[in-house]
Structure formats: structure tokens, C-alpha cells
């Protein structure tokens, strides 16, 4: 068994045996549940994601393009509707926020067009290290020369505009992990051979490595075996630390979920996935409890009506806006909440304004649109995987996770299902950096689909 003996002669590892035995039994139950979930998931996977890609003869995914165009246009319309009162009150120009957002949309469309025509996916793959390094440097720069707004330093001032590096980092992480897993996928899959006992043994070694030489040696051996995965993930973790310093807990959660999700798609075994998810959740709980304002948000989320004029003000007014919408809404422009009652109506809480003006029906249509985008992204990713375009597959799936988790969190906050956090609704909320890089990600989906279709027709795309 190879016990580790502490300096005082006590055999430490024996203390972990009862715990490990219980953990093994619990793990067996989890694995049985996971087998059922995999079978169900395979059925849903086949039903939703399998689709012919050349049956219509088109060279690109026209439905995806039109969905992005329509959602972006609707987002501009709702930004104007939600911000007209605020803009008129602040400076008298009721088109102020609409004009700024439209400028970023136009810039995003132009940049997307140029990149679509000029950069094949193999070019993107060569640029990944530079993009990731640039995003990391900008995360450092924002802490040095950033502009503080509402107590957070998240923006770099560029004249009259503000640039948010975190939005670039979200896309950079997807590209970086896609490149990493394409090259090192076998390392993750090799972890399947390690049992639960190895996990607990590795955990014990890590805990005791500071004081026990043998535990330190075994920890270093484990690190050397999986260094090709551990070191890059540590770089992503360092970026997450910089984001928490800003602080931006919402983006931290989104990027963490993207990373965990892509690890799972890359073949991380179920047992490690459960351990990783548990560790992440535990870490998030610690970060929430460490910041009084986050604790206050959680308390307000649990019972917003206890303090409707204080900590629960934003959430209660969001819920009232949604309630006023009823089935079919009050009509475009007829929202009452945007008239100074609901803070951030054109940014984080634009979904509540949409619900107020278009009702439950409008909410369902918008949620369907986001669900359609997520399924489309995973469908394109599956096609790339089937065609042997692994790098493309990871990018498409990562973008699907990004859209899905960020829209889920934003909508969840608006309807009172999640604590308040500062996240935009993709393609809808006011935010230049957000919409710019979301349009770039949509361009990547279209480019990946285009290369899928070319390969299906016999062209070489690598």
C-alpha cells in the first residue's frame, strides 16, 4: 500500500481509509445515475443535434444568420425602448444609448465580415496563443488604468467609449481550451484509468505535501503526468483571479462554467467531473460569504419583499414589471418600470422590460430563440466532430455553453430564480464590448458551419 509516515511516526494515510471506503460506495451510486443520464442524453443528442447539412444546397447556415440578425435588431429596439426615459433625463438626447449600441453593432458586423472572409479556422488556431495572451494582458491593464464604475474596475477608457476586457477573455478561453483539448485530449481520457482511491490518495498527498517529503514527491509525480493539462488550466485560473479582483463575479461564474463544460466535453471522466463541480461550488460559496455585499444579494434574493426599498429594490421591481406584462404585454414602449423605477433597465434587467412590454408570450419566444441558438451551436459542433474537425467542434460547443449559461443566468436573475449579478443578456442588453464579441462568436459559428459544408462536398479545409 505504501503508507506515508509523518515526522511524529503516525501513519497518516490510514486515517483516510474509512472515508475513502464510504466515498467509493457513494461514487458507485453516482456512476449508476450517470449511466442512466448518459443513455437519456444520447437519445436527446440524436434527436436534437443530428441533421443533414447539405440537403438545401446552401453554402452557409442561413437560418443561423437570420436568427442573429433578427435578435440583434430586436435588441437595438428594446435598448431604445428601455433607455429612452433615462437618456432624456440625463442629457436630452433620447437616442443616446441606441446610437452608441448601434455603433458597436455596426463595428461588430464589419469586423465579423472581414474575419469571416480573411481567416480560416486553421488561421484562428495559429492565432490562439496571441489572442489568449492579449486578453490576459488586458485583464492586468484594466486593474492598472481601468475606469471604476459602481465600485468595480472593469472598463478601459478609450476616449468616449469603454472597453471591457472580460468579454474578450470569454472568447479567448474558448479558443484556448479548444486548441488545448485538440492537442491533449488523450491526456484527459487517460485519467479514466485512475480510480476513486487514487483521487482520495492524491487529495491526501496534496494536503500533506507541505510537511511530508514522500507526499510531496507523489504530488509532483502526479503533476508531471498531467502537466500538459494542469498548467494551461492554471493559466485560465489566473485570469479568473484577475477577474475577481475587479470584481466581476458574474463573468467569473460564466467563464468557470465554460471551462468545466469544455473539460467534460473533452472527455473528463464522470468521477473527476463530479469532484471538479463540487470543488467549484464550494469555492463559489466561500467567495460569496467572503464579500458582505454578495451575502446581502443572496439574502435579498431569498426574500426580496422583506426590504423592497433597500436590498430587494431591484428584484422586486423586476418581478413587478414581469407581472404587469401578463400574457401579451403592455405594448412596445408602454413599460412603466423603465421610467426611473427599475435600475439598469437597459442593461442587466432588459429581460424584465421585454416581459413587461411583450408579456409571457414574448418571454417564451425569446427563451426559445436562445435555446435554438444553443442547440444550433452544439449541432454544428457535433458535425465538426463527425467530420474530424476537432478544433472547430470544441469552439462551437464552447460558444453554445457561453450563450446558454449567460442567458440562463441573466433570465434567472430577472425572474428571481437566481441572486442578482451583473451579466448582460446576449445580443439584447446595452453593452458595446458584450455585443461586439458575441457577434464575433456568431461569425465563428457561421465559419465553422461553412467549413463543415465544404468538407462534406469534398473540399479540403485543413
Swiss-Prot record:
Presence of keyword Cell inner membrane: yes
UniProt-listed Enzyme Commission number(s): 2.4.99.28
Top enzyme category: transferase
Keywords: Cell cycle, Cell division, Cell inner membrane, Cell membrane, Cell shape, Cell wall biogenesis/degradation, Glycosyltransferase, Membrane, Peptidoglycan synthesis, Transferase, Transmembrane, Transmembrane helix
Reactions it catalyzes: [GlcNAc-(1->4)-Mur2Ac(oyl-L-Ala-gamma-D-Glu-L-Lys-D-Ala-D-Ala)](n)-di-trans,octa-cis-undecaprenyl diphosphate + beta-D-GlcNAc-(1->4)-Mur2Ac(oyl-L-Ala-gamma-D-Glu-L-Lys-D-Ala-D-Ala)-di-trans,octa-cis-undecaprenyl diphosphate = [GlcNAc-(1->4)-Mur2Ac(oyl-L-Ala-gamma-D-Glu-L-Lys-D-Ala-D-Ala)](n+1)-di-trans,octa-cis-undecaprenyl diphosphate + di-trans,octa-cis-undecaprenyl diphosphate + H(+)
Entry GO CC: cell division site; plasma membrane
Localization per record: Cell inner membrane
Domain of life of the source: Bacteria
Membrane-spanning segments: 64-84, 98-118, 126-146, 161-181, 228-248, 249-269, 272-292, 349-369, 387-409, 425-445
Topological domains annotated Periplasmic: 85-97, 147-160, 293-348, 410-424
Annotated metabolic or biological route of this protein: Cell wall biogenesis; peptidoglycan biosynthesis
Membrane topology: Multi-pass membrane protein
Its job: Peptidoglycan polymerase that is essential for cell division.
Family statement: Belongs to the SEDS family. FtsW subfamily.
The protein's name in its UniProt record: Probable peptidoglycan glycosyltransferase FtsW
Natural source organism: Neisseria gonorrhoeae (strain NCCP11945)
Higher taxonomy: Bacteria, Pseudomonadati, Pseudomonadota, Betaproteobacteria, Neisseriales
Amino acid at each position: 500500500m505504501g503508507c506515508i509516515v509523518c515526522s511524529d511516526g503516525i501513519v497518516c494515510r490510514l486515517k483516510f481509509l474509512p472515508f475513502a471506503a464510504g466515498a467509493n460506495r457513494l461514487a458507485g451510486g453516482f456512476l449508476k445515475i450517470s449511466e442512466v443520464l448518459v443513455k437519456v442524453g444520447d437519445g436527446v443528442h440524436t434527436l436534437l443535434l443530428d441533421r443533414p447539412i447539405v440537403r438545401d444546397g446552401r453554402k452557409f447556415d442561413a437560418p443561423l444568420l437570420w436568427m442573429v440578425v433578427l435578435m440583434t435588431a430586436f435588441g437595438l429596439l428594446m435598448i431604445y425602448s428601455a433607455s429612452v426615459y433615462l437618456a432624456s433625463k440625463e442629457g436630452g438626447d433620447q437616442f443616446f444609448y441606441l446610437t452608441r449600441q448601434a455603433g458597436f453593432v455596426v463595428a461588430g458586423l464589419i469586423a465579423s465580415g472581414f474575419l469571416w472572409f480573411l481567416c480560416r479556422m486553421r488561421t484562428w488556431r495559429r492565432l490562439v496563443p496571441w489572442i489568449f495572451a492579449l486578453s490576459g494582458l488586458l485583464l492586468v491593464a484594466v486593474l492598472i488604468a481601468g475606469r471604476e464604475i459602481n465600485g468595480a474596475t472593469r472598463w478601459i477608457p478609450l476616449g468616449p467609449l469603454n472597453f471591457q476586457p472580460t468579454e474578450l477573455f470569454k472568447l479567448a478561453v474558448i479558443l484556448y481550451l479548444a486548441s488545448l483539448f485538440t492537442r491533449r485530449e488523450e491526456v484527459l481520457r487517460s485519467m479514466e484509468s485512475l480510480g476513486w482511491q487514487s483521487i482520495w490518495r492524491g487529495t491526501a498527498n496534496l494536503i500533506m505535501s507541505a510537511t511530508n517529503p514522500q507526499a510531496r514527491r507523489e504530488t509532483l509525480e502526479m503533476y508531471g503526468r498531467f502537466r500538459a493539462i494542469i498548467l494551461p488550466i492554471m493559466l485560465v485560473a489566473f485570469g479568473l483571479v484577475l477577474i475577481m479582483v475587479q470584481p466581476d463575479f458574474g463573468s467569473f461564474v460564466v467563464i468557470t462554467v465554460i471551462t468545466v463544460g469544455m473539460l467534460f466535453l473533452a472527455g473528463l471522466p464522470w468521477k473527476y467531473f463530479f469532484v471538479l463541480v463540487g470543488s467549484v461550488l464550494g469555492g463559489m460559496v466561500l467567495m460569496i460569504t467572503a464579500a458582505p455585499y454578495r451575502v446581502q444579494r443572496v439574502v435579498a434574493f431569498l426574500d426580496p419583499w422583506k426590504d423592497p426599498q433597500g436590498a430587494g429594490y431591484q428584484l422586486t421591481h423586476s418581478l413587478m414589471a414581469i407581472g404587469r406584462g401578463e400574457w401579451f404585454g403592455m405594448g412596445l414602449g408602454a413599460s412603466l418600470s423603465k421610467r426611473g423605477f427599475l435600475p439598469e433597465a437597459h442593461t442587466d434587467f432588459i429581460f424584465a422590460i421585454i416581459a413587461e412590454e411583450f408579456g409571457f408570450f414574448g418571454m417564451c419566444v425569446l427563451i426559445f430563440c436562445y435555446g435554438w441558438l444553443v442547440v444550433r451551436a452544439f449541432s454544428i459542433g457535433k458535425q465538426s466532430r463527425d467530420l474530424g474537425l476537432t478544433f472547430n467542434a470544441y469552439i462551437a460547443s464552447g460558444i453554445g455553453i457561453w450563450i446558454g449559461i449567460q442567458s440562463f443566468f441573466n433570465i434567472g436573475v430577472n425572474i428571481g430564480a437566481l441572486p442578482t449579478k451583473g451579466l448582460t443578456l446576449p445580443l439584447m442588453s446595452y453593452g458595446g464590448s458584450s455585443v461586439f464579441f458575441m457577434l464575433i462568436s456568431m461569425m465563428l459559428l457561421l465559419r465553422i458551419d461553412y467549413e463543415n459544408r465544404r468538407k462534406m462536398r469534398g473540399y479540403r479545409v485543413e
